[in-house]
């Protein structure tokens, strides 16, 4: 049997996942990456998207994250997510409401900082819409 890696997914609200799994596929800043046992150590940012948790030769669960950071070493991957929602709990209405709020924030933005924040909200909304599609 192949070695497993300890996966922990933490949001500001709570610890969502803490279990040994075969592999975790994370939406990294430079593209998706898979983390297995004995992975080379790294720290990276996580872009809005879906984390797929593989166990038993298949995707056992998927979680939408709004971004964050990931730390990987030979034994563990820890994702600190800004927000995390199991994909099964997402709805098209949630994604549409986020898009509407992001568009309103972009329309109301006056400063470059406000525009950047609204752009980030739109990225999260679009990633959420893709996750439920």
Curated annotation (Swiss-Prot):
SUPFAM superfamilies the UniProt entry points to: Epsilon subunit of F1F0-ATP synthase N-terminal domain
Membrane protein topology class: Peripheral membrane protein
Source taxon at top rank: Bacteria
Pfam families, per the entry: ATP-synt_DE_N
InterPro entries listed in its UniProt record: ATP_synth_F1_dsu/esu, ATP_synth_F1_dsu/esu_N, ATPsynth_dsu/esu_N
Compartments where located: Cell inner membrane
Keywords: ATP synthesis, Cell inner membrane, Cell membrane, CF(1), Hydrogen ion transport, Ion transport, Membrane, Transport
A GO term for molecular function: ATP binding
Keyword hit for Cell inner membrane: yes
Subunit note: F-type ATPases have 2 components, CF(1) - the catalytic core - and CF(0) - the membrane proton channel. CF(1) has five subunits: alpha(3), beta(3), gamma(1), delta(1), epsilon(1). CF(0) has three main subunits: a, b and c.
Function (record text): Produces ATP from ADP in the presence of a proton gradient across the membrane.
Protein name: ATP synthase epsilon chain
Species per Swiss-Prot/TrEMBL record: Paramagnetospirillum magneticum (strain ATCC 700264 / AMB-1) (Magnetospirillum magneticum)
Gene: atpC
